[in-house]
C-alpha cells in the first residue's frame, strides 16, 4: 500500500528527514511514533502530496505521489493535527461541501454522507453548527470528512491530542472500527496510543527511522538486569566481562531512575531477543566473585525501547 524509499527533506540547514525508508501493507494499522520535532508531520505531508521531498521516492498503491499527486490523494483520507473545520457550518453542510470538493457524484452524495455519519456516530448532530460541538465530536467530524470518499488509506496525525480521557477512549474505539475497511497510518508522540491501536510501530527520532517492529515482537523479548551489591566498581571491566558472555549483543548501564541508585546496575541485551541470559551471567558473576544483589529478566516494552533509542540518538 505504501512504499517510502530513501526519502530526505531539509528546511534550509535543518535536516528534517534523512534517508527514511519503510513499507506498509494493505490492511495494517501502523503507528508512526516519535517525539515532537522528530519529522512525523513532514513524513505525512510528503505521503499526502502536500510537500515534496528533496530526494527519494514515495508510492501509494503503486502510484508515484510526486508524478500523480491528485490520483494518490483520491485514495487517501487525511486528518491533520488541526482538522480544517468551518465552525459556522452545520455538520451536514460541511460534509456536503467536502463531498462536492471530493467530486462525489451529486446523486450519490447523500449515501456517502450517511455512511460516514453512521460510522462516526454523528447522526444526532447533523443540524448543529460545528462550533457548538465538543472537541471530541469536532474530531469525529474531522474523521467523517477523512472517510467520506471511502479511501483505501487513512492517515491520522495526532488524532486524540487535546481530548479528555473519555473523548480519547471514544475516538480510539472509532479508529478501530474504521481500520476494518482501511489501512491506517497513525502519527503520534503518545506511546499508549500506539499500544492501544496498532499492530506495528515505526519509531522516528531526529529525522531517522530508528525502529520498525511488530508490537507482539517487542512484548516477547526481554533483557537481563544485573545489580551488584557494592557502592563502587570498575565499571569498564564489568562491561567488558559481560560483553564476552556468549549470546550477548549489547551491555549498558541501566537507563532511567536506576542510574541514580547507589548500586551499579547493568542492562544486558541478547542477540537472540528471546534468549534467557541469566544463567550465563550468574556463572560469570560467581566465577568473578562479584557481590550479586539482583539478577532478573526485564520484559522489554515499547516505552523501554523508545527511551533507549531516544537517549542514544
Residue ranges and their predicted role:
Residues 56-67, 71-72:
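Conserved ABC transporter NBD signature motif
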Residues 96, 100, 107-125:
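Conserved ABC ATPase "signature" region
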Residues 154-158:
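Catalytic Walker B motif of ABC-type/P-loop ATPase nucleotide-binding domains
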Residues 170-270:
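ABC transporter nucleotide-binding domain
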Residues 269-313:
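C-terminal coupling/interaction segments
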